[in-house]
Amino acid sequence: MGTIFVDNLEPQSGTSLTLGASGDTVGLASGASQTLAINTPAFKARKTSDQAITHGATAKVLYETEDLDTDSAFASSKFTVPSGKDGEYFFSWSFDIINTSNQLEAWNTYLYKNGSSVFETVWNSGNGSNVFRRINHSYSCIQDAVASDYFEIYMYYESTGSTAGNLLQANKANFFTGFKLIGA
């Protein structure tokens, strides 16, 4: 095996550059990194305080803390696609909601894009006789996005007794994440 030392490797004009052949493994040396296949921008935000959701109303979910924000693109509880980062994005969100009166009956969550719903989840206990105290669910979807598109999470909530529900900050279960898909 030999070693080639170069600063730049370019194919001939109009051709492609191939490293290895079918079945070969191309590895990076210790301490080296690749910059081609990176899932950025990426973000993860979560709640750090409870948020009341009024019965029969749709509310924007407010995320107070960012655990990850590679491109400084998450602010005011929304993710905005940075310039030059067009493509397909994977989004996921989770919520933990409680109704202390044991009257949680229905909820919808929405992924909003540029102020309008583009993805909706629906859950309804049925006829009001099957109600819950606390529910935790997670959802995900893929959305096409271009620079300056922005994404937010909204929630609609109902209870049998018209009482408010609370999105809980405990256990970091209320979060919103997203990242650009490689090759999309």
Task: Go through each PLM region and give its residues.
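Short beta-strand/loop motifs in extracellular/secreted proteins, especially
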Residues: 105-107, 149
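Glycine-rich strand-loop-strand elements at beta-sheet edges
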Residues: 110-146
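Residues that act as N-cap/strand-start positions at coil-to-secondary-structure junctions
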Residues: 3, 11-13, 73-75, 105, ...
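The right-handed parallel beta-helix/beta-solenoid scaffold, focusing on the short coil/turn
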Residues: 2, 7, 15-17, 24, ...
